[in-house]
């Protein structure tokens, strides 16, 4: 085995909360749906040389299982039903669902299988890739360096917020998938826990062990899969929003808006959805324009924006979060999710810009168009054209 072949992942819960939240909904509503997903490196990194080391980690993941203590903890949360948790106790990663190869220097990964199982691969696999690559590239970087740099940023934060009322400022860790390492993420979260404005983490394992609130609702794949689950493409986003409420009628009500674009989302987000969902999450496009559109939409529907929450999570750092807080704080409730800029922010370390996105559902194409053209993902140009037509969208450039 290689130098770093000891398993990087120690628990099934070392993943983002929305994966379990979506998995339960899939378990209850779409048990037999099959999907395929693919890895993308949005940067110019040639990661193919790590394919064998990644395969070793993937093979080791089949031994992860929910512990009795973890099961009891999940049982005490309001989100989960007993039939799902009983099934989750039996869940094991199936490495045969993951194809990994070095394609001329580029890392090529494809996941396929039942959605209820494949849904679990994305976050831990990205975290493994990130940690492996950084171990090879930056073996001298340390937890202490990460913490020291965080203190510099916190000093800057205190300076830029001097005299600012932070009573409504809420920040959470969204940094699992592109973290420098598991140890760095834990150290960063433990330090941030001391701050009054830090409210939780997307990582279920850290939430359990550090007594924090697990944060997260649904991801793009929830909306993408409905493009093929729904009999009518034009109503697929409505179907996704309704199915989520069927599973979670009065909780986990933050809706992601940019699978098809914000404008298309708001056309589907009518009075009932806007009333029942607790808020919206921004993940692409201009955040100020997006927030203004959201507030105007609520106002047009006769809903007080201060009764709703806007979550910002697109490439945030402390400075961007405070800029948005200053702009919106007196008009709507706010939350800020910072990922890479928390958990992989060490001097001289270049974070990876890597994603895994759904590309097929039941053997047919799905797409993410988003409010940032460079984030658009789909192989099938004909399907993208059909999607644009169904949602009355302008031309959107496909990402390479």
Curated annotation (Swiss-Prot):
Where does the record place the modification Phosphohistidine? 220
Taken from the UniProt record, the cysteine pairs bridged by disulfide bonds within this chain are none
- Record has Transport as a keyword: no
Per the record, its GO cellular-component terms are: cytosol
Molecular function as annotated in GO: nicotinate phosphoribosyltransferase activity
* Gene3D superfamilies associated with the record: nicotinate phosphoribosyltransferase
Reaction(s) catalyzed by this protein? nicotinate + 5-phospho-alpha-D-ribose 1-diphosphate + ATP + H2O = nicotinate beta-D-ribonucleotide + ADP + phosphate + diphosphate
Q: Which residues cross the membrane?
A: none
Q: In which pathway does it act?
A: Cofactor biosynthesis; NAD(+) biosynthesis; nicotinate D-ribonucleotide from nicotinate: step 1/1
Keywords per UniProt: Ligase, Phosphoprotein, Pyridine nucleotide biosynthesis
Q: Which domain of life is it from?
A: Bacteria
Q: Cross-referenced InterPro entries, in alphabetical order?
A: N/Namide_PRibTrfase, NAPRTase_N, Nic_PRibTrfase, Nic_PRibTrfase-Fam, Nicotinate_pribotase-like_C
- SUPFAM superfamilies annotated for this entry? Nicotinate/Quinolinate PRTase C-terminal domain-like (SSF51690), Nicotinate/Quinolinate PRTase N-terminal domain-like (SSF54675)
Transmembrane found in the keyword field: no
Annotated HAMAP family: NAPRTase
Give the similarity note: Belongs to the NAPRTase family.
User: Which NCBIfam families does the UniProt record give?
Assistant: NAPRTase (TIGR01514), PRK05321.1 (NF003704)
Question: Per its record, how is this protein called by name?
Answer: Nicotinate phosphoribosyltransferase
User: Which species is the source of this protein?
Assistant: Cronobacter sakazakii (strain ATCC BAA-894)
Identify the gene encoding this protein: pncB
